[in-house]
């Protein structure tokens, strides 16, 4: 019994000591510890304005659709839901929801193939919003090359990949390149043919010739035609050409040309004949001058002595010397009186002026022949009388 009492007392004492210690520990609450916090690092998140966010959302929608298609989601109803997103965060949430629901029914095999990318987390935060690092998971394929899921660093790389992806032109015929908010470039294939840019028109060589109006051009052609026509007609004088070149209107050129041609044609068709003067030239013999050629000097007395010896000698001397021309004898007054009665002197002068030169010569020859015959006949009669 004594042992039991001692154990009991020890247990009670231990309990008192433990309880007091516990109560003492619980009563003394520890004070608040002050810890110096380090300054927060500046956020690497891109801060965009409202307009920039709208442009980024507009560019990311076709990229999101293309990625869903690559997963095998081709329903237009589901793809059209992408267009209803009003913010980049809403677009990201919608894509993740569609992806998770689709992957539950269509799990992706983990076996790697040539066409299967190394990473299957195609819709990480940095892909759509550009909030992550430049080189995140899925940026490069297993060969270390960039792919269209995560963009290309340069536009040239994106264009090369797009040309290679076109492959069969019967399906995809064109592509477009766009730059995401993350600064990387993406291509989107299209079945419509791209419009070929129009080539800039080549500049034609400038015409160095002096510019002229239509009236000046017509005047120039009219002058050239007029000069050519004058040359064709045989007119080569520079005087006429200069006159045409000085003309200031087409009408003036035509008028000058017609006047010159008319004057030139008049000279050829109606050549001027030499004027015939009524005055009698020297050594010219008229018909009446030979009426008394056998009578010597042509007086009345010489006419009466026509059958005398002196008259015969004079006639024979004249016949023996035919080369010497005799002076014309004066006309008989009686014959002049008779002719004055018939023809007036003015009329006689007009007839002489109108008579051509060839006709005069014929008349002179006939009168000479008649005079010689009359002289021979007179000589013959005088010889008979003597006998």
Curated annotation (Swiss-Prot):
Keywords carried by this UniProt record: Cell wall, Peptidoglycan-anchor, Secreted, Signal
Annotated motif LPXTG sorting signal, positions: 355-359
InterPro entries listed in its UniProt record: DUF5633, GA-like, Ig/albumin-bd_sf, LPXTG_anchor
Cellular component annotations (GO), alphabetically ordered: extracellular region
Basic and acidic residues bias locations: 298-360
Ranges where the record places region Disordered: 122-155, 266-360
Residues cleaved off as propeptide: 359-387
Signal peptide range in chain numbering: 1-26
Top-rank taxon, per record: Bacteria
Gene3D superfamilies referenced in this protein's UniProt entry, alphabetically: Albumin-binding domain
Topology class, membrane: Peptidoglycan-anchor
Places the protein is found: Secreted, Cell wall
Biased composition (Polar residues): 270-282
UniProt KW Transit peptide keyword: no
GA module: annotated span: 213-265
Sites of Pentaglycyl murein peptidoglycan amidated alanine modification: 358
Protein task: Binds serum albumin.
Name the UniProt record assigns to this protein: Peptostreptococcal albumin-binding protein
Source organism of the structure: Finegoldia magna
């Amino acid at each position: 019994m004594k042992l039991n009492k001692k154990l009991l007392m020890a247990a009670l004492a231990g309990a008192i000591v433990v309880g007091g210690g516990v109560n003492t520990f619980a009563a003394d609450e520890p004070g608040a510890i002050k810890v110096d916090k380090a300054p927060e690092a500046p956020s690497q998140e891109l801060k965009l304005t409202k307009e920039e966010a709208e442009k980024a959302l507009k560019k990311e929608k076709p990229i999101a659709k293309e990625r869903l298609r690559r997963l095998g989601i081709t329903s237009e109803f589901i793809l059209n839901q992408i267009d209803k997103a009003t913010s980049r965060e809403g677009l990201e949430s919608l894509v993740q929801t569609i992806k998770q629901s689709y992957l539950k029914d269509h799990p992706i095999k983990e076996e790697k193939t040539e066409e299967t990318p190394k990473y299957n987390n195609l819709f990480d935060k940095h892909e759509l919003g550009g909030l992550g690092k430049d080189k995140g998971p899925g940026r490069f394929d297993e060969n270390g090359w960039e792919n269209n899921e995560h963009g290309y660093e340069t536009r040239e790389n994106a264009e090369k990949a797009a040309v290679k992806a076109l492959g069969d032109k019967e399906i995809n015929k064109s592509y477009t390149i766009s730059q995401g908010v993350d600064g990387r470039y993406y291509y989107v294939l299209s079945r419509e043919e791209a419009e070929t840019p129009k080539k800039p028109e080549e500049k034609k060589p400038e015409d160095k010739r002096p510019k002229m109006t239509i009236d000046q051009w017509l005047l120039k052609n009219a002058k050239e035609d007029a000069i050519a026509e004058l040359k064709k007609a045989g007119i080569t004088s520079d005087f006429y050409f200069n006159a045409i070149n000085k003309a200031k209107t087409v009408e003036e050129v035509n008028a000058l040309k017609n006047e010159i041609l008319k004057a030139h044609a008049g000279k050829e068709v109606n050549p001027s004949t030499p004027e015939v003067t009524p005055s009698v030239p020297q050594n010219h013999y008229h018909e009446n001058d030979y009426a008394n050629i056998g009578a010597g000097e042509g007086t009345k007395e010489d006419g009466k002595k026509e059958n005398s010896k002196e008259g015969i000698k004079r006639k024979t001397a004249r016949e023996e010397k035919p080369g010497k021309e005799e002076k014309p004898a004066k006309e008989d007054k009686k014959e002049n009186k008779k002719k004055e009665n018939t023809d007036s002197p003015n009329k006689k002068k007009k007839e002489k002026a109108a008579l051509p030169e060839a006709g005069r010569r014929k008349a002179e020859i006939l009168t000479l022949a008649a005079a010689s015959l009359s002289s021979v006949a007179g000589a013959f009669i005088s010889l008979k009388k003597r006998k």
